[in-house]
Each structure stands twice: as structure tokens, then as C-alpha cells.
Amino acid sequence: MKQPVKQSTAADSSISGSRVLKYQEGYTWQERVRRAYKDESGNWTGVTRTSLVGGSDEIPVPFHLRYFEVEAGGFSSLEKHEHQHIVVIMRGRGRVTLGDHETVIAFGDVVYIAPWEVHQFGNPDGPEPLGFLCAVPAERDRPVPVERKSSDS
């Protein structure tokens, strides 16, 4: 005999340790706070980060899932690191730099970033923010900043 399916609400979104983070207006999620892209200043501007799963919350998983938004004219730091990550574009259009190549990205595109690949996300043209989900290992190294190559050389 089939058991009836219990409908979960925002107030009751935990099921045996599993849970649903309800999406809210404006690319936000219940019980999650949008923060600055990084705690320290650097060569980036107009980027925010929302930790969805893993990190400082109570969900113990071997990966972290975050949502980033890059406002018009904004960009992430140009960096590299040992860990790989996967990005899924959820909103807007922008550009990703992977090594020496720059590619236009838009809703639905998936970006894989290999270990030690120099990379950067940007939204040079706007008008809508570039929003993306990013999955990384919970245990990972710190990014290494990379100096932009001079176009004069």
C-alpha cells in the first residue's frame, strides 16, 4: 500500500536530516544571507555570495554549494587553485576567462574549472546581474591571485 506523501512547507522543510531550502524572490533562499564575495578586499568588484549547502551551516557534506551574483560592470578575482569546481549559470549573461580564453556565458551554460586553471567571471555589459551556482569540495585550498597580463607586452 502506498504511503501518502507529506507536503513540506517553508516552516517544515527538514526531513530526516535532509532538507529543502525554499527559493524566495530576488534570487534568495530561506535562512540564507547574501554576503560580500570575499571577506578580504582585492581585485574584484560588485560580487556577492550566498552559501546554500555546506560551509558555515549545519549540513555536513563533502562539498559546498554557493550562489554568486555579479552586478553590471562587476567581476570576480582573477585566480587559480588546486581544487576543481563546477558552475551553472542561472541568470543573465556574462563572460568567463579560462586560461587565455574568454567565453560569453548565459542561462543554462555549465562551466568546469580544472585544477590550477586561471579563471575569472565578469559581467561587463549588464544590464541584469550574472547569477550562478558554484559547487566546490568542502576541503579545498585557498585561491592564489593572478596578475592580469599587460596588453602592452
Tell what function each PLM region has.
Residues 67-71, 80-96, 135-138:
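Short, conserved beta-strand element in jelly-roll/cupin
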Residues 67, 86, 112, 127-144:
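A short hydrophobic beta-strand segment most commonly corresponding to one strand
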Residues 49-54, 66-81, 115:
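Conserved short histidine dyad/triad with adjacent acidic residue
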Residues 1-62, 146-153:
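A short, N-terminal "cap"/entry segment at the start of jelly-roll beta-barrel domains
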Residues 100-116:
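Short acidic-glycine-tyrosine-enriched beta hairpin
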Residues 123-124:
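Asparagine-centered strand-capping/turn motif at beta-strand->loop junctions
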Residues 48, 61-66, 85, 92, ...:
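A generic structural signal for short beta-strands and their flanking turns/coil linkers
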